[in-house]
Structures are given as C-alpha cells and as structure tokens.
UniProtKB/Swiss-Prot annotation:
Cofactor(s) essential for the protein: heme b
Record protein name field: Cytochrome b559 subunit alpha
Function: This b-type cytochrome is tightly associated with the reaction center of photosystem II (PSII). PSII is a light-driven water:plastoquinone oxidoreductase that uses light energy to abstract electrons from H(2)O, generating O(2) and a proton gradient subsequently used for ATP formation. It consists of a core antenna complex that captures photons, and an electron transfer chain that converts photonic excitation into a charge separation.
Organism: Euglena gracilis
Gene that this sequence comes from: psbE
Membrane-protein topology: Single-pass membrane protein
Cross-referenced InterPro entries: PSII_cyt_b559_asu (IPR006217), PSII_cyt_b559_asu_sf (IPR037025), PSII_cyt_b559_CS (IPR006216), PSII_cyt_b559_N (IPR013081), PSII_cytb559_asu_lum (IPR013082)
Residues forming coiled coils: none
SS bonds (residue pairs): none
Residues the entry annotates as binding heme: H23
Amino acid sequence: MAGSTGERPFSDIITSIRYWVIHSVTIPSLFVGGWIFVSTGIVYDIFGTPRPSEYFTETRQQAPLISDRFNALEQMDQFTK
C-alpha cells in the first residue's frame, strides 16, 4: 500500500530558501539562549541542581550519594547542612 501522504519531500524542504531564512535565525538563537540559560545560573535554580561549587563543602568531601531509599529524605537533610 504505497502512496503519497501529501507532504513535501524532505529534500525539497532543505533546499528551499525559505527553510534557510527561518533556520539561519532560529538555530543560532537556540544555542545562544541555551548558553545564556546555563551561564547565568538560572538552570540551576529552575531544575534544583547544585552549582559546581556546591557539590563538595568544607565538612563533606565525598560525593553526596543516597544509599538508603527508605531514609532518602533524612540523607538529603544531612547533605544540605
């Protein structure tokens, strides 16, 4: 049951001027936006991940790994102190 779906072939799309006019702006802006998102530290606040300087503290020099899934909240409290 071969047939046409009515869509444009991919080769027609990527060889069109309209495609490159649109994507010459959107692709670089995604990279710049991502770079700003990470370099300003907003990504750490939004996703709740520790900043690179917060992985190890003066009192704790090992990796903060959860070893007991039933007492995970207690272990997290110990890591954040």
